[in-house]
Amino acid sequence: MADDAGATEAQGDQCTPAQSLGRLLKLPLPPPRIRTRPWWFPVQELRDPLVFYLEAWLADSIFGPDRAIIPEIEWMSQVLLTVDIVNSGDLVEITIFGRPRVQNRVKSVLLSLANWHRKHRARAEKMNQLEEFLKTHASGPQTPEHRIV
């Protein structure tokens, strides 16, 4: 999903609402949201969730494309996480249930991971630009600037 959006942005195309709707209709349905509360999670901590938003490609990088990392994060931090796609797949809503201090700690960890992935992606884009620049300029004549007589 994030790859499709990235490819569209890279081409510079503007998706029309009809194309966007067509893409959404082709996507598989999300898994059902029926979920039982783990035995280790107290009911009273479901009252006040912490909610924040990230770009979808960051959520794919942090949690994996199929969100396989979420149960491990929940078990290790003793929180419950939900990651829901909003805004036509451009953003995800991350909801953290748990004790307030733990919620803030998990949010801080996730935002730190998001920042690292942003920097890593920017660095990779700069390296690709540098490689392209070097390829285009390396094809010219290779004559030394200063001749030794």
Swiss-Prot record:
In alphabetical order, the GO MF annotations are: RNA binding; structural constituent of cytoplasmic lattice
> Where can this protein be found?
Cytoplasm; Nucleus
Residues in KH domain copies: 49-110
Q: Which residues form a coiled coil?
A: none
- Cysteine disulfide partners in this protein: none
Top-level taxon: Eukaryota
Question: What is one term from the GO cellular component aspect held by the record?
Answer: cytoplasm
Ribonucleoprotein among the record's keywords? Answer: no
Q: Which CDD domains has this protein been placed in?
A: FILIA_N_like (cd12795)
Tell me the GO BP annotations in alphabetical order: actin filament organization; embryonic pattern specification; establishment of spindle localization; establishment or maintenance of apical/basal cell polarity; positive regulation of double-strand break repair; positive regulation of double-strand break repair via homologous recombination; positive regulation of meiotic nuclear division; protein storage
Q: Which UniProt keywords apply?
A: Cytoplasm, Nucleus
The record's subunit annotation is: Component of the subcortical maternal complex (SCMC), at least composed of NLRP5, KHDC3, OOEP, and TLE6. Within the complex, interacts with NLRP5, KHDC3 and TLE6. As part of the SCMC interacts with the SCMC-associated protein NLRP4F. The SCMC may facilitate translocation of its components between the nuclear and cytoplasmic compartments. Forms a scaffold complex with KHDC3/FILIA, and interacts with BLM and TRIM25 at DNA replication forks.
Q: Please give the function described in this protein's UniProt entry.
A: Component of the subcortical maternal complex (SCMC), a multiprotein complex that plays a key role in early embryonic development. The SCMC complex is a structural constituent of cytoplasmic lattices, which consist in fibrous structures found in the cytoplasm of oocytes and preimplantation embryos. They are required to store maternal proteins critical for embryonic development, such as proteins that control epigenetic reprogramming of the preimplantation embryo, and prevent their degradation or activation.
What's the record's remark on domains? Answer: Contains an atypical KH domain with amino acid changes at critical sites, suggesting that it may not bind RNA.
PANTHER family for the chain: OOCYTE-EXPRESSED PROTEIN HOMOLOG, OOCYTE-EXPRESSED PROTEIN HOMOLOG-RELATED
Q: What is this protein called?
A: Oocyte-expressed protein homolog
> Which source organism does the UniProt entry give?
Felis catus
The gene behind this protein is OOEP
